[in-house]
From Swiss-Prot:
This is Tax1-binding protein 3. The gene is Tax1bp3. It is a peripheral membrane protein. Transmembrane segments: none annotated. Detected in kidney distal convoluted tubules (at protein level). Disulfide bonds: none annotated. Its main location: cytoplasm. The keyword Cell membrane applies. Gene3D superfamilies: 2.30.42.10. Interacts (via its PDZ domain) with GLS2. Interacts (via its PDZ domain) with RTKN (via the C-terminal region); this interaction facilitates Rho-mediated activation of the FOS serum response element (SRE). Interacts (via PDZ domain) with ARHGEF16. Interacts (via PDZ domain) with KCNJ4 (via C-terminus). Competes with LIN7A for KCNJ4 binding. Interacts (via its PDZ domain) with CTNNB1; this interaction inhibits the transcriptional activity of CTNNB1. Interacts with ADGRB2. Keywords: Acetylation, Cell membrane, Cytoplasm, Membrane, Nucleus, Wnt signaling pathway. Residues 12-87 form the PDZ domain.
């Protein structure tokens, strides 16, 4: 899948809903955040996964810090992601060829 940040793309996406964990008075995701337009994509262990939206917000052209702030927003107990997964895209393409 060829992907150019900020450009429209046709892709197979997966919806993911994360309920944040309560740690004292804080809400936490329970995982680390990697990526962003200002980061080296080869350093991301899931570099084929692209988070397209977080709670309806377009994430295709945000920096790492902007993504972190959106994902860790204190007022949101649930994070709804729209994720493009290249492995899912490949599986769908294979099933269509069979």
């Amino acid at each position: 899948m060829s992907y150019i940040p900020g450009q429209p793309v046709t892709a197979v996406v997966q919806r993911v809903e994360i309920h944040k964990l309560r740690q004292g008075e804080n809400l936490i995701l329970g995982f680390s955040i990697g990526g962003g337009i200002d980061q080296d994509p080869s350093q991301n262990p899931f570099s084929e996964d692209k988070t397209d939206k977080v709670n309806g917000w377009d994430m295709t052209m945000v920096t790492h810090d902007q993504a972190r702030k959106r994902l860790t927003k204190r007022s949101e107990e649930v994070v709804r992601l729209l994720v493009t997964r290249q492995s899912l895209q490949k599986a769908v393409q294979q099933s269509m060829l069979s």
